[in-house]
Amino acid sequence: MEKKKVVLAYSGGLDTSVAIKWLQEKNYDIIALCLDLGEGKDLAFVKEKALSVGAIKSYMIDVQEEFANEYALMAMQAHTLYEGKYPLVSALSRPLIAKKLVEIAEQEGATAVAHGCTGKGNDQVRFEVSIQALNPYLEVIAPVREWKWSREEEIAYAKENDVPIPINLDSPFSIDQNLWGRSNECGILEDPWAAPPEDAYEMTLALEDTPNKPEFVEIGFEAGVPTTLNGTAYPLSELIKTLNALAGKHGVGRIDHVENRLVGIKSREVYECPAAMTLITAHKELEDLTLVKEVAHFKPMIEQKITELIYNGLWFSPLKQALHAFLQETQKNVTGMVRVKLFKGHAIVEGRKSEYSLYDEKLATYTAQDEFNHDAAVGFISLFGLPTKVYSQVNQKKVEA
């Protein structure tokens, strides 16, 4: 019987390594796919490990710039903070991984793709909905969800099948990282009352260890895209990396969040997103300077929906594409410079300027240079309040002073 091909999203960890052997037993030839999303792994080692475990082919693709420009950028422009806190670190990478899985599957003539998600997390939904949107004819296999083994049973299977056991397997934490940040769950973090231990963090310093003097960074934007740091131009992926180091040194971007998962449970996770939180803060301030009132007040409603769609795995949905078109239209004049103070866990905007600034000092000032037409206020108030006045007159309402 001829073997079928499956493309596996491969991380190099125990789950996806065991999945290679498990899929072989199901009569599949496995093609491993590992993406460089800026997590800092030794991906050359991961690529070779997949082959040593049993994959017939192994891909390692650097997608950092694509991730930055096509995924993280939209999240920044939409100020995506799920439940007001989480910048969608993992949720942003899943549609890109799904996209590459489908591309390699079509390229290799595979009939299926596979991922290493469990049956109780959000990522299984994000992967599978995205894959269905991109190629509804591919079979999707979720080995970890199907085998339902305990950790001990999985380790025993690995030993029986000569699958290398990672040296950090005794770590209590489950970590996911990319350019946009780092997420951490499990272990002591499963107790929402317990303070996160310092070894749960990697990208940021504890406040007591941060510098006692602030650091200032000037971020330049062109049409909503961050392009410079302190006058130096960077590709977006490098700008994010550089800002992660700068802001992380000052403890910016630590987030402790009990969130409502898509699958109906609550989970407690710790995030580190120094660049993401700094850029979102700076970008919002530049929008405040350059967007007209009606757009500035309407945009948060669109942002909320975009955030929900991304979190829920609907990146490739028609609604998300339509809302993205609106978002892009709002960014045309979001060009300028924002000065941010990094200090003791805070990214504080202290200045902003733009050639498209709608702030007119001569209209805003209370000095002798004031050019605002105060006489116009009387007529404006009369017309603006007219519906309320008429309603009160008709209904014989009396307003007590």
From Swiss-Prot:
The enzyme's first-digit EC class, named in words, is ligase
Superkingdom: Bacteria
Q: Which residues form a coiled coil?
A: none
Keyword hit for Amino-acid biosynthesis: yes
Annotated L-aspartate binding lies at 118, 122-123
Q: Does the keyword Amino-acid biosynthesis apply?
A: yes
Q: Which GO terms describe its cellular component?
A: cytoplasm
Where is the protein localized? Cytoplasm
Instruction: List the Gene Ontology MF annotations in alphabetical order.
Output: argininosuccinate synthase activity; ATP binding
Keywords of the record: Amino-acid biosynthesis, Arginine biosynthesis, ATP-binding, Cytoplasm, Ligase, Nucleotide-binding
Q: Which residues bind L-citrulline?
A: 86, 122, 126, 174, 183, 259, 271
Q: Which reaction does it catalyse?
A: L-citrulline + L-aspartate + ATP = 2-(N(omega)-L-arginino)succinate + AMP + diphosphate + H(+)
Q: Name one Pfam family in it.
A: Arginosuc_syn_C
According to the UniProt entry, what is the EC number of this protein?
Answer: 6.3.4.5
Q: Which GO terms describe its biological process?
A: argininosuccinate metabolic process; L-arginine biosynthetic process; urea cycle
Entry binding sites for ATP: 9-17, 116
Q: Which residues form the signal peptide?
A: none
- Give all cystine bridges in this chain: none
> Which family is annotated?
Belongs to the argininosuccinate synthase family. Type 1 subfamily.
Q: How does it assemble?
A: Homotetramer.
The entry's protein name is: Argininosuccinate synthase
